[in-house]
Amino acid sequence: MTEKRVHIIVSGLVQGVGFRMFVLREASARSLSGWTRNLPDGTVEVEAQGDSGRVDELIRQIRIGPSRSSVTSIKVKEIEVDTSCREFRILT
């Protein structure tokens, strides 16, 4: 299993529509670790880590988003794996 960690910024109608909970469910279903949070500029930030294929699946789901959202852009950058990260959570 090849692990990777990505940093993601999601733009569009992504706050106030259940986006962070959607990311939490999708990441947890794939046994990924990391976190998600709203940013003051209206975007959502995500860091996700785990099996490379499962991280890619999460990225595909984030591009779609929950039904009430409208994703206009997504920026993905691969970053260094954090071996201390064991769960996925929503940051406030």
Curated annotation (Swiss-Prot):
<feature type="domain" description="Acylphosphatase-like">
    <location>
        <begin position="5"/>
        <end position="92"/>
    </location>
</feature>
<dbReference type="InterPro" id="IPR017968">
    <property type="entry name" value="Acylphosphatase_CS"/>
</dbReference>
<feature type="active site">
    <location>
        <position position="38"/>
    </location>
</feature>
<keyword id="KW-0378">Hydrolase</keyword>
<comment type="similarity">
    <text>Belongs to the acylphosphatase family.</text>
</comment>
<protein>
    <recommendedName>
        <fullName>Acylphosphatase</fullName>
        <ecNumber>3.6.1.7</ecNumber>
    </recommendedName>
</protein>
<dbReference type="GO" id="GO:0003998">
    <property type="term" value="F:acylphosphatase activity"/>
</dbReference>
<dbReference type="InterPro" id="IPR036046">
    <property type="entry name" value="Acylphosphatase-like_dom_sf"/>
</dbReference>
<dbReference type="InterPro" id="IPR001792">
    <property type="entry name" value="Acylphosphatase-like_dom"/>
</dbReference>
<dbReference type="Pfam" id="PF00708">
    <property type="entry name" value="Acylphosphatase"/>
</dbReference>
<feature type="active site">
    <location>
        <position position="20"/>
    </location>
</feature>
<dbReference type="InterPro" id="IPR020456">
    <property type="entry name" value="Acylphosphatase"/>
</dbReference>
